[in-house]
């Protein structure tokens, strides 16, 4: 075996080029003097200091790292599902996604709900408030390495300050604390070993560009005649610094030119820090380079105590998200620096572009959304409270923003549907009252009459209520068999059962009417069995009839033959599609010219036998093929969409969520888009599209269901319930971040004022307050169940699990109760209309009675 290995080694040596030289150092065993707390380093670059450059050195990995990892048993499907469910709800014990969510929540809170507590400002690095963290004040234990390898004992970072610098109330309201010093283009071991380091809190990777931004850039490139691919590469080649997305992952992010600004003189240090913006495009001066070269030579001085104010003031020119923080006038004179002695190890050769990477990345870092301090928080001037636990702070910093895919998709659908609805159905009269149209129209009696058409005006600049119902608005008679509408249709059919054909004496026409409407002097009312033309059924004359242009004796399709004879009740007769005798039957009701056919008018299922001119004027649905109103189903015509499974029983329950994508007009759609691009988009960046989509849709469905119960005869469109459900998320977010806000009650009353204003605005027509109330309540339950939040200990984590179960059960109970009230035990509320529309005038609110004269 050894001979074969020796042969292979010799063959490899023969193939080695003569210019290649291999120098493999031998492994040096670790001495017994090493401390027990020595931690293995996976990156050799961590051994570099920010202070003084030295030669490159390497540390051999411990022997236990060379061992093969212990095999672990694969997790079962049950454990995987359980762990995934816990991660999704945010109650996992060791979930990185949960920590990211919690850190993001705190960032959102700092933007949306006002100022944080000063303790939070000291332990949190929130770019939205321009504050500086003082949390990297704990000095970690020094790193001991083998003396035979590196020739040194320890590396101590002087920037790692201890707890002695902490003061409980040094940060007053309105003032921001200075940043933890982060040397541009350099890092130390302490910066990475301490969990509270300022460098540790830098964002991992910037998000990709949005689709809209890339589309606009591609369109601009095409307009200029350039290729999209060339434009992208050309922009990437013009970078003067390392992209931020590769700062921490592809490299170890350490400078090629090690910074010695901590040991420089005060004048040079101030000049260096004040010229950071110029270094992006200009080279440093020769004097500064000479001073930097002289600094490592003075390495035999002993260290002294560092003054906290002087240390923090020297770093006030670091870029803080957007802009620069300048030194205040009248500051105390700097104390003289004392040289420190520190042995450092350099690990790599010079690398261009790294010196300015950290400050530029800090300057152009994308703004995150702190938990509880989003867009609404910026408008209401919220901040965190003074003190907050470091565990909560770490949860905030790990949060990453989500892409608002659901918001963009919803906005596109709303815009497209609104444009199509306005283009197809037109725009109704604009206003707050009722619009009346009067004209002279030929009716079924053969004479012209002045008729009036009443229509509710739409101040949203959009289609009429009839058109919105046809598009899929929330309308109870289309979703269930409404008792009042069904009773109204049955009474109309009962009257039609006793009607007959009224034939005018001058043979100008005939129409199906009641005896009261047929003139006894100018026409003949052909009523069976009184009239001699009555047919027989089962050996006796029929008791109901006649029907204009329909008789069982002359109809071939469908024919009235035993055992399929037409029933006695004319309201159950089918539509005759083919007659055998034509217009010469010697029956007066068959040989006349019919002047009226069924027309469905209004939105309550009212049918009237009239002329086509009158039907068109009243915006009805004229049925040329039928002769009786009982042969048509007006509710099917009014509702549109998919036909009912049973024509007598409406079943379009899908209107509960279909109406969420409709709007009453252009202004209504613009209001929804503004809400979605501000509040909804802000929340989706925090919680993700799946959670926000669940809350949005379920809140809207619950709100529409409650509105269908209490306002059954009113057509409603728009995501009113969904929007109030999203507003409820803001309240839940405020409650969850109550412990870290400086003035939570002020934020609560501001949110409450916004909700009360929107509720008052819902007293206008076409705005449903029942959907607002139900959507808000359901949004509260869903937000407590689906939105993870910041945990303040193990007890809080267990409470969250109980909270998820309880609020899910409560929401399901609320939804089940509303379903029972809608389908099983329908209720009628007379005064509920005043809760959603106050009639300031007689024509301000739309009428909902089932009177035949109202439409």
Curated annotation (Swiss-Prot):
InterPro entries: Inactive_Rhomboid, iRhom1_2_N, Peptidase_S54_rhomboid_dom, Rhomboid-like_sf. One of its GO terms (cellular component) is endoplasmic reticulum membrane. It comes from the Eukaryota. N-glycosylated. The keyword Phosphoprotein applies. The chain crosses the membrane at residues 412-432, 656-676, 692-712, 715-735, 747-767, 773-793, 804-824. Highly expressed in cerebellum, cerebrum, heart, skeletal muscle, placenta, pancreatic islet and testis. Detected at lower levels in colon, kidney, small intestine and lung. Glycans are attached at residue 583. Residues 433-655, 713-714, 768-772, 825-855 are lumenal. It holds the Pfam family iRhom1-2_N. It is found in: Endoplasmic reticulum membrane; Golgi apparatus membrane. The modification Phosphothreonine is found at residues 180, 183. GO terms for biological process: cell migration; cell population proliferation; negative regulation of protein secretion; protein transport; regulation of epidermal growth factor receptor signaling pathway; regulation of proteasomal protein catabolic process; regulation of protein secretion. Residues 1-411, 677-691, 736-746, 794-803 are cytoplasmic. It is a multi-pass membrane protein. The keyword Transferase does not apply. The modification Phosphoserine is found at residues 76, 176, 390. One of its GO terms (molecular function) is growth factor binding. Its main location: endoplasmic reticulum. Keywords: Endoplasmic reticulum, Glycoprotein, Golgi apparatus, Growth factor binding, Membrane, Phosphoprotein, Protein transport, Transmembrane, Transmembrane helix, Transport. Regulates ADAM17 protease, a sheddase of the epidermal growth factor (EGF) receptor ligands and TNF, thereby plays a role in sleep, cell survival, proliferation, migration and inflammation. Does not exhibit any protease activity on its own. Belongs to the peptidase S54 family. Homodimer, or homooligomer. Interacts with TGFA and HBEGF. Interacts with EGF; may retain EGF in the endoplasmic reticulum and regulates its degradation through the endoplasmic reticulum-associated degradation (ERAD). Interacts (via cytoplasmic N-terminus) with FRMD8/iTAP; this interaction leads to mutual protein stabilization. Interacts with ADAM17/TACE. This is Inactive rhomboid protein 1. It comes from Homo sapiens. The lineage of its organism: Eukaryota, Metazoa, Chordata, Craniata, Vertebrata. The gene is RHBDF1.
């Amino acid at each position: 075996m050894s001979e074969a290995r020796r042969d292979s080694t010799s063959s490899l040596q023969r193939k080695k080029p003569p210019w290649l030289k291999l120098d493999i150092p031998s492994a040096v065993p670790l001495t017994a003097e090493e401390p027990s707390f020595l931690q293995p380093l996976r990156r050799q670059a961590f051994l570099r200091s920010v202070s003084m450059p030295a030669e490159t050195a390497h540390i051999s990995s411990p022997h236990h790292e060379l061992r093969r990892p212990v095999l672990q048993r694969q997790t079962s499907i049950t454990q995987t599902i359980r762990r995934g469910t816990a991660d999704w709800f945010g109650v996992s014990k060791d979930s990185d996604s949960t920590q990211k969510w919690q850190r993001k929540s705190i960032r959102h809170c700092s933007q949306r709900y006002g100022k944080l507590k000063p303790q939070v400002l000291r332990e949190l690095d929130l770019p939205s408030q321009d504050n500086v963290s003082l949390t990297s004040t704990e000095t970690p234990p020094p790193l001991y390495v083998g003396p035979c390898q590196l020739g040194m004992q320890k590396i101590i970072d002087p920037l790692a300050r201890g707890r002695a610098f902490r003061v409980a109330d040094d940060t007053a309201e309105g003032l921001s604390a200075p940043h933890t010093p982060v040397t541009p283009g350099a890092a130390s071991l302490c910066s990475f070993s301490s969990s509270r380091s300022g460098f540790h809190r830098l964002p991992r990777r910037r998000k990709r560009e949005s689709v809209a931004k890339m589309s606009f850039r591609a369109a601009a490139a095409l307009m200029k005649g350039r290729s999209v691919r060339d434009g992208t590469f050309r922009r990437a080649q013009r970078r003067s610094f390392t992209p931020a997305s590769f700062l921490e992952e592809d490299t170890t992010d350490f400078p090629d030119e090690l910074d010695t600004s901590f040991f420089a003189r005060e004048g040079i240090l101030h000049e260096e820090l004040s010229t950071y913006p110029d270094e992006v495009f200009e080279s440093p001066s020769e004097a500064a380079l000479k001073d930097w070269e002289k600094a490592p030579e003075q390495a035999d001085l002993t260290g002294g105590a560092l003054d906290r104010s002087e240390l923090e003031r020297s770093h006030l020119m670091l870029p803080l998200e957007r802009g620069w923080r300048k030194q205040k006038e009248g500051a105390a004179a700097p104390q003289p620096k004392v040289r420190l002695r520190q042995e450092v190890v350099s690990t790599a050769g010079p690398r261009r572009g790294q010196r300015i990477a950290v400050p530029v990345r800090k300057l152009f870092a994308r703004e995150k959304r702190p938990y509880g301090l989003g867009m609404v928080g910026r408008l209401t001037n919220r901040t965190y409270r003074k003190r907050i636990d470091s565990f909560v702070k770490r949860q905030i910093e790990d949060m990453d923003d989500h892409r608002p895919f659901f918001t963009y998709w919803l906005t596109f659908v709303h815009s497209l549907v609104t444009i199509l609805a306005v283009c197809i159905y037109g725009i109704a009269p604009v206003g707050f009252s009722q619009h009346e149209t009067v004209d002279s129209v030929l009716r079924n009696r053969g004479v012209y009459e002045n008729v009036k058409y009443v229509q509710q005006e739409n101040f949203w600049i959009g289609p009429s209520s009839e058109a919105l119902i046809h598009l899929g608005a929330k309308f109870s008679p289309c979703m269930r068999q409404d008792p009042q509408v069904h009773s109204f249709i049955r009474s109309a059919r009962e009257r039609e059962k006793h009607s007959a054909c009224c034939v005018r004496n001058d043979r100008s026409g005939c129409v199906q009417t009641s005896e009261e409407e047929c003139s006894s002097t100018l026409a003949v009312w052909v009523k069976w069995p009184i009239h001699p033309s009555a047919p027989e059924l089962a050996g006796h004359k029929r008791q109901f009839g006649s029907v204009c242009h329909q008789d069982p004796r002359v109809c071939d399709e469908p024919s009235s033959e035993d055992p399929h004879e037409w029933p006695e009740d004319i309201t159950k007769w089918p539509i005759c599609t083919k007659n055998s005798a034509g217009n010469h039957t010697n029956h007066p009701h068959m040989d006349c010219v019919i002047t009226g056919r069924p027309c469905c008018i209004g939105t309550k299922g009212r049918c009237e036998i009239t002329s086509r001119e009158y039907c068109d004027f009243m915006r009805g649905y004229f049925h040329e093929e039928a002769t009786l109103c009982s042969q048509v189903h007006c509710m099917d015509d009014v509702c549109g969409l998919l036909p009912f499974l049973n024509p007598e029983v409406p079943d379009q329950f899908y209107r509960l969520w279909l109406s969420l994508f409709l709007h009453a007009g252009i202004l209504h759609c613009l209001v929804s888009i503004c809400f979605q691009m501000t509040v909804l988009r802000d929340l989706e960046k925090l919680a993700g599209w799946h959670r926000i989509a669940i809350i949005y849709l379920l809140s809207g469905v619950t709100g529409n269901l409650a509105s269908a119960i209490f306002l059954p005869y009113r057509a409603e469109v728009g995501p009113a319930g969904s929007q109030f459900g999203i507003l409820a998320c803001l309240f839940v977010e405020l409650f969850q971040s109550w412990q870290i806000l400086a003035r939570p009650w002020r934020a609560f009353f501001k949110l409450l004022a916004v909700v009360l204003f929107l509720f008052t605005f819902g007293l206008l027509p076409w705005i449903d307050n029942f959907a607002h109330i139900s959507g808000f309540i359901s949004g509260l339950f869903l937000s407590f169940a689906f939105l993870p939040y910041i945990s303040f200990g193990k007890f809080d984590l267990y409470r969250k699990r109980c909270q998820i179960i309880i609020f899910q059960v409560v929401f399901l109970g609320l939804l089940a109760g509303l379903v029972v009230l809608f389908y099983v035990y329908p209720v009628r509320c007379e005064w509920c209309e005043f809760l959603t529309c106050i009639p300031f005038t007689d024509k301000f609110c739309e009428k909902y009675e089932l009177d035949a004269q109202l439409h």
